[in-house]
Amino acid sequence: FRGRIYATEETANLCSIMLKDCAHIQEQEAQWKTRKNARAGLPPEEPIYSVADADACLKRFRPCPMGEKIPIAEGITVRFVNAGHLLGSASIEVFLTEGETTRKMVFSGDLGNRDLPILRGKDYVAQADYVLIESTYGDRLHTPCPDPTAFLAKCIRETLDAGGNLIIPAFAVARTQEILSCLH
């Protein structure tokens, strides 16, 4: 891929950290597997992408402010709309104009389901001609945790009072952001 990558400013900032970090981990794992493969007479292992690939990718990013219409090609304009899922998450409105007719397509991944201290709630799209949306959890309701900060504080206090060590695994970016916000 040699084109531009349009992303919200927050997503571009997050990617500058995450892409390189993930590439570094992949390179380390590939080195480990290559050493293991060499002992078994197997070919070397290659990472899916390298730190150099991540750096090249990051140069293609075009950070875009949330809510502004951005022309990307003849007759095609896009606008990022806050999805409220994690910092920088967005639905994207694509405006396709042919002659006097403009159609709007909306693409979205996860949508936030509540206001969090570090996030605004999601913005709603008023109208669209076509909508494509991720729906992994579309068939169920999430029961809200009454007070996640109080629950986390209780767990921390109990662990420290018992002389224990606290480990909080949070593999998803959104959950990590929520936990860090609660701890703050």
Which residue stretches match the model-derived regions?
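His/Asp/Glu-rich metal-coordinating catalytic cores
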Residues: 3-178, 184
